Swiss-Prot record:
Binding-site list for Mg(2+): 48
Annotated protein name in UniProt: Inosine triphosphate pyrophosphatase
Source species of the chain: Arabidopsis thaliana
An MF annotation (GO) of this entry: dITP diphosphatase activity
Binding site for ITP: 20-25, 60, 76-77, 93, 152-155, 175, 180-181
Amino acid sequence: MAAAAAKAAVVLPRPVTFVTGNAKKLEEVKAIIGNSIPFKSLKLDLPELQGEPEDISKEKARLAALQVDGPVLVEDTCLCFNALKGLPGPYIKWFLEKLGHEGLNNLLMAYEDKSAYALCAFSFSRGPGAEPLTFLGKTPGKIVPARGPTDFGWDPVFQPDGYDQTYAEMAKEEKNKISHRYKSLALVKSHFKEAGYVFQTDDGTI
């Protein structure tokens, strides 16, 4: 029985490639994943895609797997304003670059509803040709005037429900227990644990 299970195991090159060029994002992923998934980071030039978050994340995983020729993990992050029916959503990066933190607040100036949610979509592909699996994490909150350090995206303007601090004001350990990224990665970790992947090195499997 054990031999049959071993034969059925999916063998992956070690480590998995996490595609990012963002040092802060990499720092958070390392803190959340720990040693549970062997991975390395790599910055790739992937096309900027449009569509729904899950579709964008999956397509990025397909493209990255082709470039890396191996297993990859990619992430797409959204900040969605309920008053704007989900915008900026996956386009938050460009909204932030053009408008800044104050501009993001100004988008909601005419609305009483300041509620929003942070959404993280991690997609994992075992390699070229494999259908990516996507894991979604969502944290509800609201948009507030910027507070805290301004060195990590829109963190200063997002205050999660149940807290009086913005993401930027929170201790890293606290944020990493409740964030959209944490929730998505918790599902990734569960998948890897359940799948029982075997990682292969040049010297054989471990």
